[in-house]
Amino acid sequence: TQVHKNILFEFNTEVNNTNDRVADNYTQATSGQFHNLFVLDARATFSIKGFDLWVGKFLPPSDRSNLNGPYFLNVYNFPVVQAYPAIAAGRDHGAMVFKEYGGGKFKWSYGIFEGRTNASNADANPDENDNFLHAARFTYNFWTPEPGYYTTSSYYGAKDVLALAFAFQYEDDGAGTGTTAATQGDFTGWNIDFLMEKKISNGGVDNLEGAYYDYDTDDIPDTSLIQ
């Protein structure tokens, strides 16, 4: 909802189905659930001199697949190698700055978020000091710009796109299964993703998308992060 030319609010909810989603933290009270209804997004965006400040619960800077949301992926299944920390459905609580140039030719985002908690980790929370999760994403479009923070994996021939992006997340003591030196480590995750879509002469579209992911847990086992 646009309440002012420089202020926007977003509030979305989701309803649990009958599947067992405990592992995805949909049924935990700390995820904001009220009976079968939980808060999916709740954020305010303030536009200040060309910068957008986001505050609340939303998708942190991460890979294109996560920022696509459930309806703009090229395939039905979400990538199993995507293991960035999240409360539920890729979301986290925090604040972020977003900036784009040339209508989306180049854009970047950086934010600090709650990160690893008992709500996003079935084990004992390794980050007992409650350090921030730092998240950033940088995108360059070689062909037509892609405006806005959220992404899509196809424009269905509306424009030619060649986009390359780098995403990075880090949290002190954000990995592990406990709070001792033997069970606790820093979490570092990053990925490179690209999207190429080109209109062809017969009216069709060539589309190619890919990504590479890397995660480091300080050599501390943490199966809730590495899938």
List the model feature ranges, each with a label:
Residues 1-118, 125-148, 152-157, 161-163, ...:
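Outer membrane beta-barrel
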Residues 129-131, 140-227:
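Detector for outer-membrane/organellar transmembrane beta-barrel domains
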